Amino acid sequence: MIRYPNGKTFQPKHSVSSQNSQKRAPSYSNRGMTLEDDLNETNKYYLTNQIAVIHKKPTPVQIVNVHYPKRSAAVIKEAYFKQSSTTDYNGIYKGRYIDFEAKETKNKTSFPLQNFHDHQIEHMKQVKAQDGICFVIISAFDQVYFLEADKLFYFWDRKEKNGRKSIRKDELEETAYPISLGYAPRIDYISIIEQLYFSPSSGAKG
């Protein structure tokens, strides 16, 4: 039995045949996939086509009860998912270190900053200090956005100074880059990175 930090029991997802997967329409307003699913498929596409090497970091697990039916075998009877101390994804693109977090919200007017934790913000600041490319991919308001870490830090610092505890919809639209949903890749965030960090005419937004 594996449990999340909130005590809920982990239920593995049912497998989906490759035939059914190919029939999914690339519509973000009516899709069967989560943001994580879309990003995993995107990263697989990048890897297969030798574009970038980006992987999702495994969720740390704390094992609390192990049964040994045989001397050479062990059965985990109880374990808990631990809260990650960093971000969801990391890897490399054109020699630059890539590190990002992925978040979703169903809020219709703003993106709550409570979706982040202090240690994640600190980790992203450390990545930026080492000249890494760090950002957040946000699914909100029926759209996917690419928000640079520096912009997130502004909203976070505002919250820490007893300011607004969320990013308004208009603020996100003003400071983030919308990512169009495609088929292969589904969420082409590398194209945004290319424009921001590798294009001769690149320029950060805002």
Curated annotation (Swiss-Prot):
Region (Disordered): 1-34
CDD domains assigned: RecU-like
Annotated source species: Bacillus subtilis (strain 168)
EC number(s) on file: 3.1.21.10
Cofactor binding mode and count: Binds 1 Mg(2+) ion per subunit.
Effect of K56A: Cleaves Holliday junctions, no interaction with RecA, greatly increased sensitivity to DNA-damaging agents
Gene name in the database record: recU
Binding site for Mg(2+): T86, D88, E101, Q120
Enzyme class, spelled out: hydrolase
Protein name as annotated: Holliday junction resolvase RecU
Positions bearing the site annotation: Transition state stabilizer: K103
